[in-house]
Each structure stands twice: as structure tokens, then as C-alpha cells.
A protein has these predicted regions:
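Transmembrane alpha-helix interface/packing and boundary motifs in multi-pass membrane proteins
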Residues: 26-32, 71-78
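Functionally critical mobile loop/hinge segments
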Residues: 1, 8, 99-194
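Conserved phosphate/anionic-ligand binding catalytic regions in large, soluble enzymes, centered on
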Residues: 26-42, 84-89
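Alpha-helical support elements that line or immediately flank enzyme active sites
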Residues: 38-54, 94-102
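C-terminal structural cap/anchor segments
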Residues: 78-109
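Alpha-helix capping and helix-loop boundary segments enriched in small/acidic/polar residues
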Residues: 4, 32, 36, 57, ...
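Accessory "access/gating" subregions that flank catalytic or transport cores
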Residues: 1-36, 180-194
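Acidic-glycine-rich active-site phosphate/pyrophosphate-binding loop
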Residues: 4-23, 55-73, 112-121
């Protein structure tokens, strides 16, 4: 896959998750109560900050943006859901990367909407090794969401669960995660207990 910053950002986040899911006991930052989400909102942003030679202040702002964006997305979903939290975290990492790359408010919000349009609906079936793959995919969606916007491409209200405006899109995703996945969660538990 190469060694460009995009690949390194995904690989490092996935490696951090893989280590945790396989027993590594080193401490990790959390987001929304999850170490994997903490890794996902932080490691790609840090990787890009180093590549772009960002100042400490730019890095801290990007990390704050990424973390708060993930929390804002997660709030309507609630604490427990079959909706994979890495999806929100990957979109949020894309927001932080957009900021580091010089993106303004419009770039940041369209990055998040684009990323959510790409990967919303991934299920959470417990903490295990495959979380690393989901994280890599979610980070890719975040980066792709930003690149799409920079190329004049975006998803619009009416494209699936995407609504007009960031807040309505987040409400839509929140509804999917909270209400739409109740039955999914029950079925996942049945499958895992077989």
C-alpha cells in the first residue's frame, strides 16, 4: 500500500487498536468512553500534523476539533448501540485532518457529512481484532470525505440518510444508531451466543 501519510495514518490507528484488542495493557486516550475511538480520533490527526509540520497549537486545535466532533456525533446515539463508534471517530479524524490541511468550517462539516455518507451503518459486534480493520476503513472514509470536498464533490440531502445541513445529518445518523439498530443489537447478541 505504500508509505504515504494517508496509509500511515490508517495503519497506525489500526495497529493501536489491534494491539489493544489482543491484550496490550498500555494506557490510551479515550473518546466517548472507548479506547478504540480515542485512538481513531487522535492517531491519524497526529500523523498528519507531523507530516504537515504543524505547530503544537495547530495540533492541539485539530485534536480538540476531532475529539469534540466525535462526541457531538455520538451524543444522539447514546452509550450502547450496534452502531460502530469507529465510524464517528473516523469522520471526526477527517475533520481534524481537514483543519490541519487549511480547511475552513465548510470543509470540516462537508468532510464529516461525506465520511458518514460513505461508512454509516457499520455494526459493532464487540471489542475484538476486527475493530482494527473497521478503524482503518473509517479513517479512510474521513480522509476521502475531505478529498472529495476539496475536489468539488459532496453528498447532498436526500442521498440516503444524508440530510440538508450537518446538524440534520447528525440527527439522521443518531436516529439510525439509537432507534434503527435496536433489533440489530439483539440479533448480534443472539449470533454471538450461539
Amino acid at each position: 500500500y505504500g508509505n504515504d501519510v494517508r496509509t500511515r495514518a490508517k495503519a497506525r490507528a489500526a495497529a493501536g487498536s489491534d494491539a489493544r484488542m489482543n491484550g496490550c495493557e498500555l494506557p490510551v486516550i479515550i473518546n466517548s468512553g472507548s479506547g478504540n475511538q480515542g485512538i481513531t480520533v487522535s492517531v491519524p490527526v497526529i500523523t498528519y500534523a507531523k507530516e504537515l509540520k504543524a505547530t503544537d497549537e495547530q495540533l492541539y486545535r485539530a485534536l480538540a476539533l476531532s475529539n469534540l466532533t466525535a462526541i457531538h456525533q455520538r451524543t444522539p446515539i447514546g452509550r450502547l448501540s450496534a452502531y460502530c463508534g469507529a465510524v464517528n471517530a473516523g469522520a471526526a479524524a477527517g475533520a481534524g485532518i481537514a483543519y490541519l490541511s487549511g480547511g475552513d468550517y465548510e470543509a470540516v462539516i462537508h468532510t464529516v457529512v461525506n465520511a458518514l455518507a460513505i461508512v454509516s451503518g457499520i455494526i459493532c459486534d464487540g471489542a475484538k481484532a476486527s475493530c482494527a480493520g473497521k478503524i482503518a476503513f473509517a479513517v479512510e472514509a474521513g480522509i476521502l470525505g475531505y478529498n472529495m470536498y476539496m475536489q468539488g464533490q459532496q453528498f447532498y440531502g436526500g442521498d440516503g440518510i444524508v440530510k440538508k445541513g450537518i446538524e440534520d445529518t447528525l440527527k439522521s445518523v443518531g436516529r439510525l444508531g439509537k432507534d434503527g439498530m435496536k433489533g440489530t443489537n439483539e440479533e448480534i447478541i443472539k449470533i454471538m451466543l450461539e
